[in-house]
């Protein structure tokens, strides 16, 4: 989508158009420095404003390690959704609606770094294990709904045990980063449960341009300074499944991903 008109046309064709999808949708972006809802005329909710300010402060802190995230927030090439509960089935339809809009709109940002941030108001996961279960439960429901309309992105695998796995929604592959208050790692410890969706193709573009390795090295150096050790789940795409990295919880060899794609 390269023009505002084309983006609006895609938004009008959004297949996630049920009453529940509209009720739970919360697609927000900055316009003139003000947070606004972009799929309807309602104002951004108070929680959306608070979550947006908190997330910007979290990522733009000098110690935060992910340089791509910093770039996206500085350039305002991100969208933010504010929802009730991560493990609420009703939220899934609104999240699907907003992710479809983001997949359609992100190409118009003309930036190497774009991201969709889904923040959930209810803090009900007292452990990393509880958050991980809620994360995969929501991704499973999201996929089950999305599979009615879209095939899995053919550039990646739908098998979470495959080193080529990446989560797909609206026909687009995403690397998902989970954040929550109970995270053991500082870089994953945020005030509310949060899922960050980063388009897989932007990493592939960085590789094609020869910039990925240098950026990765800088990020890992910053992570080492912040945490004292790298996340044991870290691996390069194509060597091990990225599914292990989504929740941020260290996983052992016996870990099994609960996600199963429809075929």
Task: State where each predicted segment sits.
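Conserved beta-strand segments of the P-loop GTPase G domain that flank and frequently precede/overlap
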Residues: 118-121, 198
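Compact mixed alphabeta submodule
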Residues: 180-221
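Polyanion-binding catalytic cores of nucleic-acid enzymes and NTP/SAM-utilizing transferases
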Residues: 120, 129-133
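Non-catalytic accessory regions used for complex assembly or targeting
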Residues: 1-111, 123, 134-152, 207-263
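Aromatic/basic-lined ligand-recognition segments
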Residues: 154-191
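Non-heme Fe(II)/2-oxoglutarate
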Residues: 112-117
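Short acidic, S/G/P-rich loop/turn micro-motifs used as interaction or catalytic elements
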Residues: 123-127, 182-183
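Active-site ExK catalytic segment of metal-dependent nucleases
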Residues: 81, 138, 177-179, 196-198
């Amino acid at each position: 989508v390269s023009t505002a008109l084309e983006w609006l046309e895609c938004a009008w064709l959004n297949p996630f158009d049920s009453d529940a999808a509209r009720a739970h949708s919360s697609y927000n972006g900055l316009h003139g420095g003000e947070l606004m809802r972009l799929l309807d005329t309602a104002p951004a909710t108070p929680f959306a404003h608070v979550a947006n300010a908190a997330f910007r402060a979290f990522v733009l802190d000098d110690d935060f390690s992910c340089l791509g995230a910093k770039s996206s927030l500085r350039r305002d090439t991100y969208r933010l959704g504010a929802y009730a509960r991560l493990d609420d089935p009703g939220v899934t339809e609104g999240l699907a609606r907003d992710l479809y809009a983001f997949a359609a709109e992100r190409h118009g940002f003309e930036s190497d770094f774009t991201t969709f941030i889904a923040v959930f108001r209810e803090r009900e996961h007292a452990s990393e294990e509880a958050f991980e279960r809620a994360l995969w439960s929501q991704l499973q429901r999201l996929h089950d709904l999305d599979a009615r309309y879209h095939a899995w992105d053919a550039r990646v695998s739908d098998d979470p045990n495959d080193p080529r796995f990446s989560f797909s929604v609206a026909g687009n592959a995403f690397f998902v980063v989970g954040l929550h208050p109970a995270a053991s790692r500082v870089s994953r410890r945020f005030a509310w449960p949060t899922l960050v969706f980063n388009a897989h193709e932007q990493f592939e573009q960085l590789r094609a341009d020869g910039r990925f390795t240098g950026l990765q090295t800088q990020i890992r150096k910053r992570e080492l300074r912040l945490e004292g050790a790298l996340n044991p789940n870290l691996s390069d795409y194509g060597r091990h499944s990225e599914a292990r990295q989504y929740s941020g919880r260290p996983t052992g060899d016996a870990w099994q991903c609960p996600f199963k794609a429809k075929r």
